[in-house]
């Protein structure tokens, strides 16, 4: 696919600097770009690469464009502009519309126009697939589940029964949606399983990475709202609610019945304990353990930073002595006041 700078300027609302008829075929970094490619400068620390780039054109802010002598598209946010152009020129392979001969589809399932069902996929009873849904090889969609139009399941995704996924979503390989939540009652030391009879409700424009697990609700539903992005190997337990446009990085864990607000960022390897709520706009740093309610937006951290091992060992010992040291300081303060 080829597109001119003029066409891209119309897409982005950008100002053209240079040849409006120049054709672009793909995007690349400043360092790797060659003729026919569009690049971008979103961080001034890469300005030296801008001067040396072989890109045919560059997405720039107005400030950076004033010092650049090549072809440019001037935008308010070059990184967002890059994302939009990358979407336009995306060459990711798509499933061919139609049903592979090895796919197993229940006669009660409803398939929208343009749906693509890959090899060895299984579509259960009363499933509804919207228009242009892509179901990759080896996927399973359980009974009474609904998948909205233009949503794609990559190979080997498992969607259990009573799961609703909205339109324009992406679910990557190995992910499981709707497995049983970790619900058990303890009867004199023996675990009694609680049937997980809720479902999962996923909104529109949601992307879920590879090998992520989203448990079904115990009674009500687990909910992932519109615009949420979830990385690889994330665990979302039963009855969790993830608010609109929240981002969750790899390896993060949300325990059962916790609610995460809108526009939050959950850093990689972080964990939120069960039955808690996190306010809108909260940024949880990577590796943080959240064990109490967060009521106000802001950045929250708890992980110990990496340090040389000997220093870490000494500090760990001191941390264990912290309560004793605090008591000693209080005693010294009282003694000092008494001697005044």
From Swiss-Prot:
Keyword flag Acyltransferase: yes
Pfam families: Hexapep, LpxD
Assembly behavior: Homotrimer.
InterPro entries associated with the record: Hexapep (IPR001451), Hexapep_transf_CS (IPR018357), LpxD (IPR007691), Trimer_LpxA-like_sf (IPR011004), UDP_GlcNAc_AcTrfase_non-rep (IPR020573)
Pathway: Bacterial outer membrane biogenesis; LPS lipid A biosynthesis
Keywords: Acyltransferase, Lipid A biosynthesis, Lipid biosynthesis, Lipid metabolism, Repeat, Transferase
Enzyme active site: 238 (proton acceptor)
Function: Catalyzes the N-acylation of UDP-3-O-acylglucosamine using 3-hydroxyacyl-ACP as the acyl donor. Is involved in the biosynthesis of lipid A, a phosphorylated glycolipid that anchors the lipopolysaccharide to the outer membrane of the cell.
GO BP terms in the entry: lipid A biosynthetic process
Domain of life the protein comes from: Bacteria
Annotated organism of origin: Shewanella frigidimarina (strain NCIMB 400)
Gene Ontology CC: one annotated term: membrane
Protein name: UDP-3-O-acylglucosamine N-acyltransferase
Record family assignment: Belongs to the transferase hexapeptide repeat family. LpxD subfamily.
Top-level EC class as recorded in UniProt: transferase
E.C. no: 2.3.1.191
Reactions catalysed according to its record: a UDP-3-O-[(3R)-3-hydroxyacyl]-alpha-D-glucosamine + a (3R)-hydroxyacyl-[ACP] = a UDP-2-N,3-O-bis[(3R)-3-hydroxyacyl]-alpha-D-glucosamine + holo-[ACP] + H(+)
Molecular function GO labels: N-acyltransferase activity
